[in-house]
């Protein structure tokens, strides 16, 4: 265990005090600094990314009782009540400044990127997420399991690197779970968002043909990501793509037009989802699901090796 006496006992943090609006966020300069437990490292945060999940966690959107507008009284990524006060922030880049018992001394001083899905703390089938079940990066310091703090050697700034963990790991998990292969036609919704834009780039690296659905005003932004075809969100999907033409759908949107996604999937097609920014309640005709032999993947828990 390394010496923490040179570190402050209090720190600055943005603290969530309950579910609701921005009024539930409190800027504190006297929040207790965490100390690393056995097997953990203490990180001085260089940068922390902001994601939709921070909003969703704040309003309790992940709860099973979530209404269409996301209003609930409690709820975390696991659907259990969130403990308050809570420091949010799933995306963290920083440097190791203290070690818990049993951690390799060589870790001290390392620049690290933290895996938002803390796989080493997996509880049965449920994952522990930074900034939800455990305090995250909206603070000067954060303590995480050493196994989930990955050493990096990059010319990118801390701010640039902090944009990677949640978006890119989620996108890679979607592609991994759905088994995207070279030559397949992959349709990606919300393609200019964090997860969507990452999915476009990662699917292209796998050799897939990528069709990206975007809002009209963001078509030019998405063009630089390398999608083979850009489809305006305003255009009816069946008209733009045609029935039974897509091998895999990567979806982070959901919403009222969701049934059209199953229409464009080929028989034995695969659908993977990890978001519902247009609304979580959708209409499903079970006949469409079983007569086309479709496979649906809900993707939150990350496969081993996805982050690496």
Predicted feature locations:
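NAD(P)H dinucleotide-binding glycine-rich loop of Rossmann-like/cofactor-binding domains
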Residues: 78-87, 112-190
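Hydrophobic/small residue at the entry helix of a nucleotide-binding pocket
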Residues: 170, 194-195, 256
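Glycine-rich phosphate-binding loop and adjacent beta-alpha segment
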Residues: 126-127, 214, 256-308
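Glycine-rich beta-strand-centered segment in the early N-terminal region that forms part
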Residues: 32-48, 63-118
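N-terminal Rossmann NAD(P)H-binding glycine-rich loop of SDR-like oxidoreductase domains
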Residues: 192, 196, 200
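Adenosine-nucleotide cofactor-binding segment
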Residues: 188, 204-258
């Amino acid at each position: 265990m390394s010496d923490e006496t040179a570190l402050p006992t209090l720190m600055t943090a943005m603290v969530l005090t309950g579910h609701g609006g921005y009024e539930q966020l409190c800027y504190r300069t006297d929040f207790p600094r965490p100390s690393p437990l056995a097997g953990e490292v203490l990180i001085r945060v260089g940068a922390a990314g902001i994601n939709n999940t921070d909003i969703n966690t704040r309003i309790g959107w992940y709860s099973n009782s979530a209404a269409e507008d996301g209003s609930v009284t409690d709820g975390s990524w696991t659907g259990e009540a969130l403990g308050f006060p809570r420091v949010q922030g799933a995306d963290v880049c920083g440097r190791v400044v203290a070690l818990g018992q049993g951690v390799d001394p060589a870790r001290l001083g390392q620049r690290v990127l933290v895996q938002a899905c803390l796989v080493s703390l997996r509880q049965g089938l449920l994952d522990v997420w930074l900034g939800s079940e455990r305090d995250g990066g909206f603070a000067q310091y954060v303590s995480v399991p050493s196994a989930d703090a990955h050493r990096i050697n990059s010319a990118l700034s801390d701010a640039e690197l902090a944009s990677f963990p949640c978006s890119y790991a989620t996108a890679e998990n979607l592609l991994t779970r759905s088994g995207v292969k070279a030559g397949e036609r992959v349709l990606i919704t919300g393609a200019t968002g964090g997860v969507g834009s990452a999915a476009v780039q990662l699917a292209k690296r796998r050799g897939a043909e990528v069709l990206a659905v975007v809002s009209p005003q963001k078509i030019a932004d998405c063009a630089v990501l390398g999608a083979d075809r850009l489809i305006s969100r305003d255009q009816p999907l069946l008209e733009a793509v045609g029935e039974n033409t897509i091998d895999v759908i990567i979806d982070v949107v959901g919403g009222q037009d969701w049934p059209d996604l199953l229409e464009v999937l080929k028989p034995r097609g695969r659908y993977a989802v990890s978001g519902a920014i247009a609304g979580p309640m959708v209409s499903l005709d079970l006949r469409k699901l079983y007569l086309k032999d479709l496979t649906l993947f809900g993707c939150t828990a990350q496969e081993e090796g996805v982050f690496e």
